[in-house]
C-alpha cells in the first residue's frame, strides 16, 4: 500500500490571500483531469507509474499543469514530474486582486488570452462603483457598450451601435427571452443579483445561435460559497434626482456539498428631473412642472433563489427568479395630449399614472456539469414566462368605439430552453467543444390594440468548436454551426367592423390585420481566429459569419405603436440577416514589475458587412395622421473600434482614457448612403482615481471621477434628429468603515452625476425623438454592509 501511495500525486489548492482551501478547482496534467474535493485536494492515482513508462519510451517527464477556478486567475506551469513530489501546494490569486485596479477606474478588465474574439470580464467592484438606474446604464462606461434608455429605470444594451435582438443577454447559462424587439422594452434582470459579467463584442452566433450577431452580455451568479460558511449583504441606495429609495438583501450559505443563495430587491422612484422647463414635441410646447418629466415614476420588486450541489464529479445548480416592474411613460408623448386628459399628472411626482407598463418575468433553470475522465458535460434546461402589459387611456380610434379597459396590449411569452455542451481534453494541446441548443417560444397577445400577432418559434442549432495550442504563445480556434428555425404566426381580425369598398359595393367587415403563416429558416455560422501573446503584448484576429432569424414584428407587425408615434408594418418575405465580420485586438503592457502595471494600451478595431440588414424605414403613407413605417432589407457596411489607454504613475493614482467609434453606411435601397438608427456618436471617456492613506477609521478611501464627451451626431436616419455633442463630468468618493467588525467593514459611496447640471441629449435614448434631455444633476449614496 505504501509503495502504491508513493505513485499517487496530491495537489492542494488554496487561496493566496486567505489561505483557505479551494474545492471544485479544475486541475489538469497533460491529458489527465481532476477536480479538488472539499479539502482542496486533487488526487492523481498511479501517475508516477505512467510517467516512468513514458520516460522509458524516451518521452519527456515535463507536463503542463493547469488549474482553473471561478473567481481566480488561471494557473499554468511546466512541471518536471520525474522528481516525484507526491504533494504539491499551489496558491491561486483572486481575480479581484488583480482586476480591482482596473475596474474601479473604469478600465476594461483582463481579456481572455486563448480566445481569438474580443471578450471582457466585469466584476462586482466595477458594478458597485458604476451602479446606475439600470444594469445596462451601469455598463455603458465599457468602451463599445452603450444603452438605449427608457426613462430613468429601464434600458437595453447595444454593442457597437447594434441592439434589440442583435445582442444576446445570457443569465446563468440561459438566453434571456422577453419582448426585446420593442423600443420601449427594458431588461428584466436584478442588477444586484449579479456577480460577474462577460461581454463579447462581435459576432457570437457560433456559440449562442441566432440573435448574437452583434455580441453577448453573459451575466453570471455562479461563485461557490466557502465550505461551512454563512454570509450576507445589505445594500441601501438613495438618489435625489427622482427620489429613489432602494434596498437589496442577500444571503448565501454552504454546507459540505449543498449550498444556497437568495436575494430580495426593492426600488421605488418618482418622476425624474431634467434641466429644462419646456419640451417641444410634434409642434406642441409642454411645460414641465418643477422640471419633472411627468409620469416617469416606477417601482421594482425582485426575488432570486438558487440551490446547488457540488462534489468531485458533479456540480448542479437550480436558479429561480422573479422580476416585477411597473413604470410610467412620459404622458405628453403617447398619442394623447395631456390637456385632453382628466388625470392630474402634476399632483404628485411619485404617482404611476396612465400610460404605463407592467412586466413580470419568471425564470427557472438548472445547470448541471458532469466532470468525467477526459471531458466535461454541461446540461442546461430552463423555462421563462414574460408577462408584459401596456395600459393607456382608452379612446375611440376610427371605427373602434371607446374600449372599456385600459389594457392596450398584453404579451405573454413562454420560453423553453435546452442546451447541452461537451468539452473534450483527450490531447494536451487540443480542446474540442460540441453542443446543441434548442429553444421554443409561444407568444400570446391580448388587449384592444394590435401590433404583432400571436406566434410560436422553434430554433435548434448544433456546433463544433476547436481550440489548438501551437505553443505557449500561439493559440488557434475555429468552429462551425448549423441552425434551423420555424416561425408560425396566427391570423388576427379586428374586434370591430369597418366599411370595405369592393367593386363599388360597401360592406361592414372585421378587417384582417395578420395572416396565418408557417415560415422556415436555416443557415450556417462559422469563425476562425488566432491569438499570439508575448510577455507584454497580445495580438488577436478573428473572422466569422453570423446570422439572425427575422422576428415576428419584422415579418408580421401591422398596427399603431403609440410609444413611437407611428404605424408599423412588417414584411412576410424577409430573409435571415447574414453578417461577415473581422475583429482584431492589440494590447501592450509597459513597465511591468512586481505585478505593478504602469501603463498599457489596447486597440480593438472591427469591420462587418450585412448582405440583408433588416430595419424599419418611413414611407409616404399615413394611417389616421400617423406616418407608416415598413420593414425592409438592405446591404450595410460598418466599421469602427475602441482604444483604451491606462497610466498608473504611482499606486495611489490611476488614469484611463478611452475612445469608441462606429461608422455605418447603407449601400443600397431608399436610404442608400444613410447611417443606421441609434448609431452612437464618437465618444471619449477620461477617468481619474486617487487612493488616500487610511485615516482614523476610514479605510481604502478613493476619489474617482470621469469626464464623458461626445461629438456632434449628424449622421442620422430620419426621423432621427441630429444630436449636438456634450461633455459631462461625474465624481464620487468611496470609503470603508469598520462599524460592526474589522473583517466586514461598511462600504459607503457617494456619487454626483452631471456636476454642472448641463442640458445633454443622448442620441440613443428612447426619448430623444421627442426632445427630452438626460436627467439633471443627481447625487446618489449607497451603503453596503456584509456579514
What does each model-identified segment do?
Residues 242-269, 280-330, 360, 366, ...:
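Transmembrane beta-barrel wall of Gram-negative outer-membrane proteins
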Residues 235, 240, 349-367, 505-533, ...:
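Outer-membrane beta-barrel signature, preferentially recognizing the C-terminal barrel domain
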Residues 294-300, 313-373, 383-414, 443, ...:
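Flexible loop and strand-edge segments within Gram-negative outer membrane beta-barrel domains
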Residues 600-610, 614, 628-713, 784:
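Gram-negative outer-membrane beta-barrel transporters
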Residues 45-47, 51, 59, 174-201:
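Short acidic/polar hinge/loop motifs at secondary-structure boundaries
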Residues 86-91, 101, 135-138, 153-158, ...:
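N-terminal periplasmic accessory domains that precede
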Residues 14, 26, 68-72, 83-128, ...:
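Short, acidic, small-residue-rich periplasmic hinge/interaction motif at the N-terminus
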Residues 269, 275, 547, 611-612, ...:
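C-terminal beta-signal and adjacent terminal beta-strands/loops
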Amino acid at each position: 500500500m505504501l509503495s502504491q501511495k508513493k505513485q499517487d500525486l496530491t495537489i492542494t489548492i488554496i487561496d493566496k490571500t486567505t489561505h483557505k482551501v479551494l474545492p471544485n478547482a479544475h486541475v489538469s496534467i497533460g491529458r489527465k483531469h481532476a477536480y479538488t474535493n472539499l479539502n482542496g485536494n486533487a488526487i492523481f492515482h498511479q501517475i508516477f507509474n505512467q510517467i516512468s513508462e513514458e520516460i522509458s519510451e524516451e518521452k519527456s517527464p515535463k507536463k503542463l499543469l493547469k488549474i482553473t477556478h471561478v473567481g481566480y486567475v488561471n494557473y499554468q506551469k511546466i512541471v518536471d514530474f520525474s522528481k516525484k513530489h507526491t504533494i504539491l501546494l499551489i496558491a491561486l490569486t483572486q481575480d479581484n486582486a488583480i482586476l480591482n485596479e482596473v475596474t474601479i477606474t473604469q478600465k476594461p478588465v483582463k481579456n481572455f488570452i486563448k480566445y481569438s474574439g474580443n471578450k471582457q470580464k466585469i466584476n462586482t467592484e466595477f458594478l458597485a462603483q458604476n451602479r446606475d438606474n439600470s444594469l445596462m446604464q451601469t455598463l455603458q462606461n465599457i468602451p463599445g457598450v452603450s444603452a438605449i434608455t427608457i426613462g430613468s429605470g429601464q434600458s437595453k444594451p447595444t454593442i457597437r451601435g447594434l441592439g434589440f435582438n442583435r445582442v444576446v443577454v445570457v443569465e446563468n447559462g440561459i438566453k434571456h427571452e422577453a419582448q426585446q424587439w420593442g423600443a420601449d422594452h427594458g431588461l428584466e434582470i436584478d442588477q444586484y443579483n449579479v456577480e460577474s459579467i462577460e461581454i463579447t463584442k462581435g459576432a457570437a452566433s457560433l456559440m449562442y445561435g441566432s440573435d448574437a450577431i452583434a455580441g453577448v452580455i453573459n451575466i453570471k451568479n455562479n461563485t461557490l460559497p466557502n465550505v461551512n460558511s454563512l454570509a450576507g449583504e445589505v445594500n441601501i441606495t438613495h438618489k435625489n434626482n427622482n427620489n429613489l429609495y432602494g434596498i437589496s438583501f442577500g444571503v448565501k450559505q454552504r454546507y459540505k456539498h449543498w449550498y444556497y443563495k437568495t436575494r430580495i430587491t426593492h426600488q421605488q422612484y418618482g418622476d425624474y428631473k431634467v434641466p429644462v422647463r419646456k419640451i417641444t414635441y410634434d409642434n406642441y410646447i409642454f411645460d414641465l412642472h418643477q422640471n419633472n418629466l411627468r409620469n416617469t415614476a416606477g417601482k421594482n420588486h425582485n426575488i432570486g433563489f438558487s440551490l446547488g450541489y457540488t462534489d468531485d464529479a458533479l456540480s448542479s445548480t437550480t436558479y429561480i427568479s422573479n422580476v416585477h416592474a411597473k413604470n410610467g411613460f412620459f404622458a405628453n408623448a403617447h398619442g394623447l395630449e395631456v390637456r385632453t386628459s382628466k388625470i392630474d399628472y402634476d399632483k404628485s411626482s411619485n404617482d404611476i399614472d396612465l400610460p404605463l407598463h407592467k412586466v413580470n418575468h419568471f425564470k427557472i433553470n438548472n445547470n448541471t456539469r458532469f466532470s468525467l475522465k477526459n471531458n466535461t458535460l454541461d446540461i442546461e434546461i430552463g423555462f421563462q414566462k414574460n408577462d408584459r402589459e401596456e395600459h393607456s387611456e382608452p379612446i375611440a380610434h376610427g371605427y373602434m368605439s371607446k374600449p372599456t379597459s385600459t389594457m392596450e396590449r398584453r404579451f405573454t411569452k413562454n420560453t423553453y430552453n435546452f442546451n447541452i455542451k461537451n468539452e473534450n481534453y483527450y490531447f494536451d494541446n487540443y480542446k474540442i467543444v460540441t453542443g446543441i441548443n434548442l429553444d421554443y417560444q409561444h407568444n400570446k397577445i391580448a388587449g384592444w390594440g394590435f401590433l404583432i400577432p400571436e406566434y410560436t418559434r422553434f430554433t435548434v442549432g448544433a456546433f463544433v468548436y476547436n481550440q489548438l495550442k501551437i505553443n505557449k504563445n500561439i493559440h488557434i480556434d475555429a468552429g462551425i454551426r448549423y441552425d434551423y428555425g420555424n416561425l408560425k404566426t396566427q391570423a388576427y381580425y379586428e374586434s370591430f367592423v369597418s366599411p370595405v369598398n369592393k367593386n363599388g359595393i360597401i360592406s361592414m367587415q372585421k378587417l384582417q390585420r395578420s395572416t396565418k403563416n408557417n415560415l422556415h429558416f436555416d443557415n450556417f455560422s462559422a469563425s476562425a481566429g488566432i491569438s499570439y501573446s508575448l510577455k507584454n503584448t497580445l495580438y488577436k484576429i478573428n473572422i466569422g459569419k453570423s446570422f439572425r432569424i427575422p422576428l415576428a414584428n419584422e415579418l408580421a407587425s401591422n398596427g399603431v405603436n403609440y410609444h413611437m408615434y407611428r404605424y408599423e408594418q412588417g414584411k412576410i418575405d424577409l430573409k435571415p440577416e447574414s453578417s461577415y465580420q473581422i475583429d482584431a485586438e492589440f494590447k501592450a503592457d509597459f513597465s511591468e514589475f512586481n505585478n505593478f502595471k504602469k501603463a498599457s494600451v489596447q486597440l480593438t478595431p472591427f469591420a462587418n458587412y450585412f448582405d440583408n440588414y433588416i430595419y424599419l424605414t418611413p414611407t409616404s403613407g399615413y394611417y389616421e395622421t400617423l406616418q407608416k413605417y415598413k420593414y425592409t432589407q438592405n446591404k450595410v457596411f460598418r466599421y469602427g473600434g475602441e482604444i483604451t489607454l491606462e497610466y498608473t504613475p504611482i499606486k495611489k493614482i490611476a488614469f484611463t482614457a478611452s475612445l469608441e467609434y462606429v461608422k455605418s453606411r447603407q449601400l443600397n435601397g431608399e436610404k442608400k448612403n444613410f447611417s443606421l438608427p441609434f448609431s452612437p456618436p464618437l465618444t471619449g471617456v477620461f477617468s481619474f482615481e486617487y487612493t488616500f492613506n487610511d485615516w482614523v477609521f476610514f479605510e481604502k478611501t478613493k476619489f474617482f471621477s470621469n469626464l464623458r464627451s461626445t461629438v456632434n451626431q449628424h449622421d442620422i436616419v430620419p426621423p432621427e434628429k441630429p444630436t449636438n455633442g456634450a461633455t459631462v463630468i461625474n465624481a464620487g468618493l468611496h470609503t470603508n468603515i469598520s462599524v460592526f467588525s474589522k473583517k466586514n467593514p461598511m462600504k459607503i459611496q457617494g456619487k454626483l452625476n452631471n456636476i454642472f447640471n448641463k442640458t445633454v441629449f443622448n442620441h440613443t435614448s428612447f426619448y430623444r425623438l421627442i426632445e427630452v434631455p438626460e436627467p439633471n444633476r443627481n447625487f446618489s449614496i449607497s451603503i453596503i454592509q456584509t456579514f
